[in-house]
């Protein structure tokens, strides 16, 4: 079973099939883990010396996402109401759907498996790489997840081989398999106590 996320090679292929303008919002998501819906709403004032200041639309949580200097310079040069203005009006931001169309077109040109493509593609790639390097807790904090089950999804990026797994393999496999089977049967999956916190996440 192959996880639905883009590996480094696929990300590079996708980048090569896009213009700089098309790639920029995805680059932000890849570097920060921000949802595309939050990226497209960014304004020039949100880009500061310590990173991107944002409020997550789904949770209402405030955060500061660190970004490399080269990306900060690129974003700082953007003028207008929004960093990513709509094609139709500079007073409106680019839509999530427009970004999704860009991803699909670039994916087809690059020959990337469309199964791994979605508006969340860069957020997933960010989470998987961060999980491999820093572990579960760091990813949970970076993505602002209150429900540990949501973060655990990213720990299964290599669940077919168990490579780079920081959680006990038996526990990880069992939990995901049970969840998948019950959801397929239309049954609710009752998470362990530490995972029952409510929150709007993805």
Residue ranges: model-predicted function:
Residues 46-49, 135-155, 160:
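Short, polar N-cap/turn motifs at the start of nucleic acid-interacting alpha helices
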Residues 35, 113, 146-149:
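Short coil/turn motifs that cap or connect alpha-helices
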Residues 8, 32, 41-74:
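Conserved tyrosine-mediated DNA breakage-rejoining catalytic core shared by Y-recombinases
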Residues 57-76, 81-105:
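C-terminal catalytic core of Y-nucleophile DNA break-rejoin enzymes
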């Amino acid at each position: 079973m192959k996880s639905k996320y883009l590996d480094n090679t696929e990300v590079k292929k996708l980048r090569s099939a896009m213009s700089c303008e098309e790639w920029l919002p995805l680059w932000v998501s890849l570097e920060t883990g921000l949802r595309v819906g939050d990226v497209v709403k960014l304004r020039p004032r949100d880009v500061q010396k310590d990173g991107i200041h944002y409020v997550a639309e789904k949770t209402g949580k405030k955060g500061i996402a660190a970004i490399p200097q080269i990306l900060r310079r690129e974003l700082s040069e953007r003028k207008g109401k929004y960093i990513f203005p709509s094609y139709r009006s500079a007073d409106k931001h680019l839509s999530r759907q427009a970004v999704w169309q860009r991803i699909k077109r670039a994916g087809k040109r690059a020959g990337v498996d469309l199964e791994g493509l979605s508006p969340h593609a860069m957020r997933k790639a960010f989470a998987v790489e961060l999980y491999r390097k820093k572990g579960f807790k760091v990813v949970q904090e970076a993505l602002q997840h209150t429900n540990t089950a949501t973060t655990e999804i990213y720990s299964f990026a290599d669940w077919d081989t168990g490579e780079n797994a920081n959680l006990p393999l038996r526990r990880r496999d069992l939990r995901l398999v049970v969840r998948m089977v019950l959801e397929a049967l239309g049954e609710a999956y009752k998470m362990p106590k530490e995972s029952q916190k409510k929150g709007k996440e993805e």
